[in-house]
């Protein structure tokens, strides 16, 4: 049975997210000799070579012995990167972590391969606490799904989706999600300073509170709504703060913000599809 530890895995693109996945695979015991990374940037190749990873600037060379090919390039260079590989990936599992790149778009560019998995990761994967929304074409069987989960699991949570359209919702919730929490942290730190705390104190308290609240929500049998109610005493300080949130319609604005993110994700996917068709 195929497992991530007995596969040759090629990464087309060696940026931060690719390096996060590589780090996760190495931590699970995948030998460096089974990983090849193709990237045009010499500095990126040098960083990976220092870890014992085989690198090249030649995508054709990189995929030669690969069982799995992970596409990790910027959306704007997708067509340029994939067109020379057309017809050469039909015997390989292709995993894309490229934002906005629909399975049909990738399939049209590479030709032949229908074993395509689309992943929407997020940046906490860099510290092994990511959240990955995953969708696969019908040609991707159980073994390929398990293999994909193994490759991604070392960097965080993996959730398989029922249809590809849900990727846009995943993008809005978890793909862009870290920025929402950073925004809240910024605001709380700024408020703490305005209330008389030193910046380093306000920062430490805010970050630890965010970590603790997330850990409570993950480990508790109660929902986040129930946890919020449990710490909100009648006429207390928490209620005073939450009433300000309610008057400002924070909940409604968050829903509107995520809807805007989903819409933009849909637009970007369409723009990328149109661009690749015109190449």
Residue ranges and their predicted role:
Residues 1-57, 61, 193-194:
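NAD(P)+-binding Rossmann beta1-loop-alpha1 motif at the extreme N-terminus of oxidoreductases
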Residues 35, 62, 198-205, 227, ...:
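Small-residue helix-packing motif on alpha-helices
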Residues 42, 51, 59-64, 68-134, ...:
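Rossmann-like NAD(P)(H) cofactor-binding subdomain of soluble oxidoreductases
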């Amino acid at each position: 049975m195929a497992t991530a530890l007995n596969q040759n895995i090629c990464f087309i693109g060696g940026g931060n997210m690719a390096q996060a996945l590589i780090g996760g695979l190495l931590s699970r015991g995948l030998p460096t000799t089974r990983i090849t990374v193709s990237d045009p940037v010499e500095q990126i190749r040098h960083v990976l070579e220092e870890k014992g990873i085989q690198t090249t600037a030649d995508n054709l060379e990189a995929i030669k012995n690969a069982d799995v090919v992970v596409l990790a390039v910027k959306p704007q260079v997708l067509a340029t990167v994939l067109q020379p590989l057309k017809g050469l990936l039909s015997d390989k599992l292709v995993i894309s972590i490229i934002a906005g790149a629909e399975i049909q778009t990738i399939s049209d560019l590479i030709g032949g391969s229908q074993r395509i998995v689309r992943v929407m990761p997020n940046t906490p994967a860099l510290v092994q606490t990511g959240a990955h929304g995953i969708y696969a074409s019908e040609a991707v069987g159980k073994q390929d799904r398990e293999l994909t989960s193994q490759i991604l699991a070392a960097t965080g949570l993996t959730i398989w989706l029922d249809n590809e359209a849900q990727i846009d919702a995943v993008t809005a919730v978890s793909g862009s999600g870290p920025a929402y929490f950073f925004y809240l942290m910024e605001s709380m730190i700024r408020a703490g300073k305005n209330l008389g705390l030193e910046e380093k104190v306000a920062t430490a308290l805010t970050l630890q509170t965010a970590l603790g609240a997330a850990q409570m929500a993950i480990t508790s049998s109660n929902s986040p709504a129930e946890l919020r109610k449990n710490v909100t005493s009648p006429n207390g300080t928490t209620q005073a703060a939450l009433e300000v949130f309610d008057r400002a319609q924070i909940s409604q604005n968050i829903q509107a913000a995520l809807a805007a993110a989903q819409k933009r994700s849909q637009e970007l996917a369409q723009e990328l599809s149109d661009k690749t068709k015109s190449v």
